[in-house]
Design a protein with these regions (language model features):
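N-terminal cap/lid segment of alpha/beta-hydrolase-fold proteins
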Residues: 2-23, 234
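Conserved HGGG/HGGXW glycine-rich cap/lid loop of the alpha/beta-hydrolase fold
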Residues: 17-75
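Conserved acidic catalytic loop of the alpha/beta-hydrolase fold
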Residues: 90-108
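Conserved hydrolase catalytic core segment
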Residues: 106-145
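A catalytic-pocket lid/entrance helix-loop region that shapes and gates access to the active site
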Residues: 129-183
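Conserved alpha/beta-hydrolase "acid-adjacent" motif
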Residues: 245, 270-276
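Short beta-strand/loop motif that positions the catalytic acidic residue
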Residues: 256-257, 263-265
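Catalytic active-site module of serine/aspartate enzymes centered on a nucleophile-bearing elbow/loop
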Residues: 287-319
């Protein structure tokens, strides 16, 4: 099964969400189709046109938004003078609701990958009546231990690369690399220090999934503006526990029981270990849980593609 051809947007714009922030959005596919919202990962990557291919453009109204301070949303975190104090998970949930109202959507299908799955779940738990169905890939609970795994403990798989990552934060910060990098990226006034930290951060991000079959280096890590935007936003969120209460996503899972959903997760996902998806499936038993043997944390896997297309095809027929 192949993805659908990527269609160009038939509508786009900037939504003023307050506080000087404007969120960029696009709509493609059928203007009269089932509304579907794609929530990108990161946080801080921005939207990818290729993700539209997961949806039948004849049946879906495919909506994308660049989360605050990234992609084409303004102001951009690529500008070091831009402060990120008004960029939290709750701000993003509010932005999604404002976009839904702006576009005249009653209920929509949500797709989220990795961090996007976290955001989709938090939004759905607060606004379950606005969610028609959910497709979650590479599930992330974003608990403190999950984040420590990514940036501390995962160094056991990549000791040489992690040594370089750790050294970039300074020897005295070995036990809290998230806070150290957040300070280097969001508090320092030295541009050369900030750029070096951004480069080191993205080098580690690129390593995380490098054992997966079909892995390719991140295509945007050669863009200094993307590198700074992404690393600043990611460290801002993850050094603050993603602005979530402890175990929030699992504790609020009971609010999802009336929402159809599918959790698609690679059994060999090292970035977001399998237990995260398993725990969510246990807390949300009405969702379908698709375990993909031999699959890691890469969307290039044919079994990931097939599982996504099966779900989006089925959800196009929901009332």
């Amino acid at each position: 099964v192949e993805y659908f051809p990527t269609t160009e947007p038939h509508d786009e714009g900037y939504l003023d969400v307050g506080g000087g922030h404007k969120v960029f959005w696009t709509a493609s596919g059928s203007p009269l189709g089932v509304p579907a919202l794609i929530l990108h990962g990161g946080p801080g990557t921005g939207s990818s046109p290729g993700q539209r291919g997961m949806w039948d453009p004849q049946r879906y109204r495919i909506i994308q938004m660049d989360q605050r301070n990234c992609g084409r949303s303004t102001p951009s975190a690529a500008d070091p003078a831009v402060r990120l104090t008004d960029n939290t998970t709750q701000h993003l949930v509010s932005d999604i609701e404002q976009l839904r109202e702006h576009l005249g959507v009653d209920r929509w299908v949500l797709w989220g990958g990795s961090w996007g799955s976290t955001l989709a779940l938090v939004y759905a738990q607060q606004h379950p009546e606005r969610v028609r169905a959910m497709v979650l890939v590479f599930m992330m609970l974003a608990r403190r231990g999950d984040l420590r795994w990514l940036y501390q403990e995962m160094g056991r798989y990549f000791p040489a690369e992690w040594e370089r990552f750790r050294a970039g934060a300074g020897e005295e910060n070995e036990d809290d690399l998230l806070s150290a990098y957040n300070n280097l990226l969001n508090e320092t006034t030295d541009e050369s220090v900030r750029r070096a930290a951004a480069s080191n951060w993205c080098a580690w991000e690129d390593v995380i999934s490098s054992l997966d079959p079909g892995w390719r280096p991140g295509p945007f890590y050669g863009d200094p503006d993307f590198v700074l935007q992404f690393s600043r936003i990611t460290t801002h969120y993850f050094s603050n526990d993603a602005f979530l209460e402890p175990n929030q996503v699992l504790n609020e899972a009971h609010r999802l029981m009336d929402i159809p959903g599918v959790i698609i997760h690679g059994r060999d996902d090292r970035a977001n270990p399998y237990d995260m998806a398993w725990l969510l499936a246990r807390a949300w038993p009405t969702a379908e849980f698709r375990t993909l043997p031999g699959v890691g944390h890469t969307p290039a896997s044919p079994s990931v593609r097939d599982a996504i297309l099966e779900a989006t095809t089925r959800y196009a027929d929901l009332p």
